[in-house]
Amino acid sequence: NWLLEIAGGNYFVYIKRLSANDTGATGGHQVGLYIPSGIVEKLFPSINHTRELNPSVFITAHVSSHDCPDSEARAIYYNSRYFGKTRNEKRITRWGRGSPLQDPENTGALTLLAFRLNEDGGDSTAVDIWVCVSPDEEDIIETAIGEVIPGTLISGPAGRILGGLSLQQMPVNHKYTIPEDWQQRFPSGNEI
């Protein structure tokens, strides 16, 4: 049901398998989910400038797949290159303690982030997250969108990316009554 809600809503989805760097399994000091700069720019246009050092905005992060508290994640443009230093990157940080995004056990897990789009073109204010916990969950998603290979990502409007899921759930018009024996074995065209 979560996927159907996302597929039919005004969301931008970002889908990937969590890397060891994403989850902190490498032991690096910069634990955090990699999201390409262009996606951060699209979702958070207000921070895409160099008028001030490190502009940022907060976003409510809810994890539907796991029982953990919501967090106030932070979309930030580290733009110190324009202020005499070296950094020039955009990130989403502060996912919160206990987030499955930062659990080394989830390295390799198929993960979906559904950012609610602002209808006026402003910043996204909420993201709903699903980190798959089983091969069955992954199969449901990959049946609709294709295989997600580690190191690749899929992103775009939810209706376009997950459109196959929403089509599968369309109600059927039952104008005609199907004969009882057809429920057991549907006849061929010649038999009809």
Give residue spans per PLM region.
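Short, surface-exposed beta-strand/loop "edge" segments at domain boundaries and coil↔beta transitions
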Residues: T23-T26, H66-S71, D120-S124, E138-I140
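A broadly used, surface-exposed interaction patch
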Residues: P45-P100
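Non-membrane alpha-helical secondary structure
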Residues: G32-I35, G84, T107
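Long, contiguous hydrophobic alpha-helical segments, chiefly transmembrane helices and signal peptides
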Residues: L18, A75, T111-L113, I192
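Elongated alpha-helical scaffolds
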Residues: K90-V127
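OB-fold ssDNA-binding interfaces and closely related basic DNA-contact patches used
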Residues: N1-S65
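Intrinsically disordered, low-complexity acidic/Q/S/K-rich activation/interaction tracts characteristic
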Residues: F12-V13, R87, R91, L165
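Mixed-charge (acidic/basic) macromolecular-recognition segments
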Residues: N118-I192
